Amino acid sequence: AMTSDCKYGFGTELTISFDETLSRVETLLKNRGFRIFTRLDLKEIVEGERIKDIGNYVILGACNSEFAKELFSADPDIGMLMPCNIVVYEPGNGKCRVMVKDPVRIMDLINNPLAIHAAMKVKDQMEIIIEELKQDDI
């Protein structure tokens, strides 16, 4: 199910393995014109400390050049909100969780119709990716 407990993002939990989920997310992003520019591993960020209940945890930073052109044209400061972050992690319940930052929620603060319009297109693509992931999870 689409997880609704997060106020600034959306996503799903899958039963497939972490590695399989990560590779599937990367493929689906690429299929929708998103390039992955950053890949952060939580282990590196927290210098090997264990965070209670969390297993593998990777943050992917992705951008779609078409949407990025629209966003930067609408507001050059938008770079602070880039890239689009997608997290893939093991929450400790035997599943794999995929969450996407909700670009529209964040753009609402900007109050620029062009930026909001571009953000809605990004969100549509991300929602499709989450749906595609759920369909794979038999």
Label the model's feature ranges:
Residues 109-138:
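Well-ordered alpha/beta subsegment
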Residues 2-32, 131:
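Terminal, regulation- and interaction-focused segments at domain boundaries
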